[in-house]
UniProtKB/Swiss-Prot annotation:
Signal peptide: none
Quaternary data: Homodimer.
Protein name, entry field: Glucose-6-phosphate 1-dehydrogenase, cytoplasmic isoform
Keywords annotated in UniProt: Carbohydrate metabolism, Cytoplasm, Glucose metabolism, NADP, Oxidoreductase
Source organism per UniProt: Medicago sativa (Alfalfa)
Pathway listed: Carbohydrate degradation; pentose phosphate pathway; D-ribulose 5-phosphate from D-glucose 6-phosphate (oxidative stage): step 1/3
InterPro entries: G6P_DH, G6P_DH_AS, G6P_DH_C, G6P_DH_NAD-bd, NAD(P)-bd_dom_sf
Active site: 274
Residues that bind NADP(+) 2: 357, 366, 370, 394, 402-404, 422-424, 488, 510
Summary of the function given for this chain in its UniProt record: Catalyzes the rate-limiting step of the oxidative pentose-phosphate pathway, which represents a route for the dissimilation of carbohydrates besides glycolysis. The main function of this enzyme is to provide reducing power (NADPH) and pentose phosphates for fatty acid and nucleic acid synthesis.
Transmembrane segments: none
A GO CC annotation given for this chain: cytosol
Length: 515
């Protein structure tokens, strides 16, 4: 069955779902299985997210049990001890924190086994079934959530084992869902092959392709900002916007992950998933409703409107010292920096360059969206010298939204200066804990909300955009230029930004408000 045939009716949003509907969705036992339980992703992200949901009483202990599965031969207590330091500070933890962790870890059980053998998965199924029998009521159903914190190379075999041995067996309802992590392939062909292999085992509503950027607070805020504020509606188009930047910067290199990173590079690692998802939310048309399929339909339309990438609108870089890592080949052509211009061929965005930039070992760590507006026509204040209006969404660190605008310089003279209107989340929402991305996305999976997950046709359209460029890099037809660690990246990237029309404000630095 084709992906586009799935239009699952789900809730409009967490906030508008009725208590009755939510109760129906969460009836019965819930078994959460973390495959790859001894790996870094599981220890640093998956289990801490589950713990935070538990603390918020969103994983009731009388319904939920958590299973770790991996090849390592360790006991339940050994896994619990490994996880403990990731859940609570080693020093200074309060008695309440220690008690919460102890109670949570009692819900965690470990099963050891290979990823391609029925024996291990039948043992896992036996353990899950025993939990369901002990915790289920006569009226309840059983729900099974499998989180694959594993390399994509083992997805097909693991999914086959789940399908063969571990599916929900309750006659009273329930479900089986599978969460898979990026990267979803290396190019269009491998992504489609992976999608086909998983798609032969599970239907699209059972598959949750997780991209943690879609769980970030300000990424989720994009739809609200765009479609719930009237003053943006007439401005959000090529008549008023000159260019859009989507930026991901890290101030550290590969840090011991050189061998792994070299297989993918900065483009595969960041751009077709995280940054392209952000682009979709910036550029999409208003969906018919907040139902997941309506939102994802609009995102696919954006992706299918992106023109082929031009070689002269790409700058690749590799920081000096990258190949000093013994796990990286001396002649590696892998980029650690990339700036590319994407152009959307539709009525709203014709002529507006979307500048997508990602890099490692740069002079700062941040992720942000910068929407730069055109110059004021007939400007009587000569404010062009001060810089353009920009709407900036800071995704990390120090989540914030601010608008750069020109105002009168305080004093006796009529002179203009650039300032900002800003919303700093740390200042405005003191005392409110902003959930981590994985918390939101795991909860969405439990609730059956696929709004913030990648559909198969989205994945295909994303790879169609970048596969030709990636193949040219793989063949050595495009080569990265060297840049100094701790710099802005290659000078050629700044030249490309200027060519695309981005105007830098000289000397302007946004300073987050202090608490």
């Amino acid at each position: 069955m084709g992906t586009n045939e799935w239009h699952v009716e789900r809730r409009d949003s967490i906030g508008t779902e009725s208590p009755v509907a939510r109760e129906v969705l969460e009836t019965g036992t819930l078994s959460i299985v973390v495959l790859g339980a001894s790996g870094d992703l599981a220890k640093k992200k998956t289990f801490p997210a589950l713990f935070h949901l538990y603390k918020q009483e969103l994983l009731p202990p009388d319904e939920v049990h958590i299973f770790g599965y991996a090849r390592s031969k360790i006991s339940d207590d050994e896994l619990r001890n490994k996880l403990r330091s990731y859940l609570v500070p080693e020093k200074g933890a309060s008695p309440k924190q220690l008690d919460d962790v102890s109670k949570f870890l009692q819900l965690v059980k470990y099963v050891s086994g290979p990823y391609d053998s029925e024996d291990g998965f039948r043992l896992l199924d036996k353990e899950i079934s025993e939990h369901e029998y002990l915790k289920n009521s006569k009226e309840g159903s059983s729900r099974r959530l499998f989180y694959l914190a594993l390399p994509p190379s083992v997805y097909p075999s693991v999914c086959k084992m789940i399908k063969t041995c571990c599916m929900n067996k309750s006659d009273l309802g329930g479900w089986t869902r599978v969460v898979v992590e990026k990267p979803f392939g290396r190019d269009l062909e491998s992504a489609e092959e992976l999608s086909t292999q998983i798609g032969e085992l599970f239907e699209e509503p059972q598959i949750y392709r997780i991209d943690h950027y879609l769980g970030k607070e300000l990424v989720q805020n994009m739809l609200v900002l765009r479609f719930a504020n009237r003053f943006f509606l007439p401005l959000w188009n090529h008549n008023h916007i000159d260019n859009v930047q989507i930026v991901f910067r890290e101030d550290f290199g590969t840090d011991g992950r050189g061998g792994y990173f070299d297989q993918y590079g900065i483009i595969r690692d960041i751009i077709p998933n995280h940054l392209l998802q952000v682009l979709c939310l910036i550029a999409m048309e208003k969906p018919v409703s907040l139902k997941p399929e309506h939102i994802r339909d609009e995102k696919v339309k954006v992706l299918e409107s992106v023109l082929p990438i031009r070689d002269d609108e790409v700058v690749l870089g590799q920081y000096e010292g990258y190949t000093d890592d013994p796990t990286v080949p001396d002649d590696s052509n892998t980029p650690t920096f990339a700036t590319t211009i994407l152009r959307i061929h539709n009525e709203r965005w014709e002529g507006v360059p979307f500048i997508v930039k990602a890099g490692k070992a740069l002079n700062s760590r941040k992720a942000e969206i910068r929407v730069q507006f055109k110059d004021v026509p007939g400007d009587i204040f000569r404010s062009k010298k001060q810089g353009r209006n920009e709407f900036v969404i800071r995704l990390q660190p120090s989540e914030a939204i601010y608008m750069k605008l020109t105002v009168k310089q305080p004093g006796l003279e009529m002179s203009a200066v650039q300032s900002e209107l800003d919303l700093s989340y740390g200042q405005r929402y003191q005392g409110i804990t902003i959930p981590e991305a994985y918390e939101r996305l795991i909860l969405d999976t439990i609730r059956g909300d696929q709004q913030h997950f990648v559909r198969r046709d989205e994945l295909k359209a994303s790879w169609q955009i970048f596969t030709p460029l990636l193949h040219k890099i793989d063949r050595g037809e495009l080569k990265p230029v060297p840049y100094n660690p701790g710099s802005r990246g290659p000078a050629e990237a700044d030249e490309l930004l200027e060519k695309a029309g981005y105007v830098q404000t000289p000397g302007y630095i946004w300073i987050p408000p202090t608490l």
